[in-house]
Regions:
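Rossmann-fold dehydrogenase core element
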Residues: 2-10
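Hydrophobic/aromatic pocket-lining and membrane-interface residues
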Residues: 1, 20
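C-terminal catalytic/substrate-binding lobe primarily of soluble NAD(P)-dependent oxidoreductases
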Residues: 13-14, 21-215
Length: 216
């Protein structure tokens, strides 16, 4: 039919992919070189799962049970980098304390997709970020015991436990009241450059529909 499929052009992964690019452009302007380490930190996300999203994640988990070898692909941040393998990446599968931001951070459930796309973009731009580039994404939970407890809870919880059925999803009011806020921190020469990417409306619906339309 001549149709073209544009992958990863919604909330996953445009705000993250372009957020890193915007940050690196700023870092290069100021320091003459890119940051070798960037931390993506989700500071806020107000939205709901849809039944279709939940079904897709469920199908992914079912496929992993049938083909355990796919776990290696899912866990490899360079799986979309056409054979290129960079340095070991920061761990993002359990809660950690981000000392530079003074907050506990938890694993972000879409990081396995976003990190792969960020590294692929780096490859497609002839390693504009450098071949030693490191990147991870985590979810900010706050400082102190409360932050640690929240991070531990998210790390051990199942996001699909009370997911809606396919065809179900958030109301129009809920979609319009959603939002997100992602911080990107580029570490370079013992300094850190911060930029933020913010969006209105539910990340997976209102924001994603706008990004998909613009990508098309």
């Amino acid at each position: 039919s001549g149709s073209r499929i544009v992958f990863s052009c919604g909330f996953d992964s445009i705000p993250f992919d372009l957020g890193v690019l915007f940050l690196q452009n700023e870092v290069v302007k100021r320091f003459g070189k890119p940051a070798s380490n960037v931390r993506g930190r989700v500071r806020g996300m107000n939205g709901e799962f849809s039944g279709g999203t939940a079904a897709s994640l469920g199908a992914t988990m079912a496929a992993l049970k049938e083909k355990p070898e796919l776990f290696a692909v899912l866990a490899n941040p360079f799986a979309l980098s056409n054979g290129f393998t960079g340095p070991d990446q920061p761990a993002d599968i359990k809660p950690v304390f981000d000392e530079k931001l003074d907050t506990w951070v938890a694993p972000f459930f879409m990081a396995p997709i976003n990190t792969k796309n960020v590294h692929r973009s780096n490859l497609l731009m002839n390693h504009f970020y450098g071949e030693d580039f490191c990147y991870n994404e985590m979810w900010v939970q706050g400082s102190g015991d409360a932050g640690k407890a929240a991070a531990d809870f998210i790390s051990s919880s199942n996001p699909l436990s009370d997911a809606p059925k396919p065809g179900e999803g958030p109301s129009r009011e809920s979609r319009e009241n959603g939002n997100y806020d992602v911080l990107f921190c580029g570490d370079i020469d013992e300094q850190s450059v911060h930029v933020s990417v913010k969006g209105d409306m539910d990340p997976g619906y209102g924001s994603t529909s706008k990004m998909i339309s613009e990508s098309a």
